[in-house]
Amino acid sequence: MDFTDRWRRTRQAMETGRVDALCLSVGSDLPYLTGYTAMPLERLTMLVFPLDGDPMLVVPELEAPRVETDGHDFVVRPWSETQDPIGIVDAALGDARRVAIGDETWTRFSLALQNVGWQRAWIPASDLMVGVRIVKTPDEVDRLRAAAATVDRVVDAMAGVRWSGRTERDVAREIRDRTLEAGHESMEFAIVASGPNGASP
């Protein structure tokens, strides 16, 4: 995956919003810009994405082998148990005065960064990223159509499956398994609801 256009549009949004740096941790914005999905650990993973210069992915040492840069220009900065990841991120931010931080960043990390970077203004990253991500490239539209078509085929195939005598969880598991077998990389959830209040799971 080539992230060049996404980086360009993100930096345009940062420039328009007068944002010096973007800090992303868990959530969907990180893989959107890097292809890497952070595990929700008690150890900090954070992308420091400056307006100018190469981004840096600060990641626990044990997780570093999972990171694939795909030849893209971001620095992977592993940290060990004896190092301070907040200090590493703070140093990477340098002179940044206005920083957008990921909305899903754990509070303990957000507060720690605000404490050491008290001189900075902190804003939600969604102020930038929603506008960047809402505009789809032709390739992204094609991928969305392909994903939707796959799910449509799975739903059509489920019409011939026995539903009675099964739990909603069991049916949801079958939907998930069929979707993964059809080529999806992941499936976060499937809502299967029946009976009273079934339309409001």
Identify the residue ranges that each predicted region occupies:
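Active-site pocket-lining segments that scaffold enzyme catalytic pockets across diverse folds
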Residues: A148-A159, E168, I175-R176
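A composition/biophysics-driven feature that prefers long, compositionally simple stretches
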Residues: M1-R153
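Short catalytic-site patches enriched in acidic/histidine residues
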Residues: L30-P40, S126-V130, V135, R166-P201
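Conserved short loop/turn motifs at secondary-structure junctions
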Residues: G102, A159-R166
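Secondary-structure boundary elements
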Residues: T150-D156, S164, E181-E185
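Hydrophobic pocket-lining residues that define ligand/cofactor binding sites across diverse proteins
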Residues: M14, R162, T179
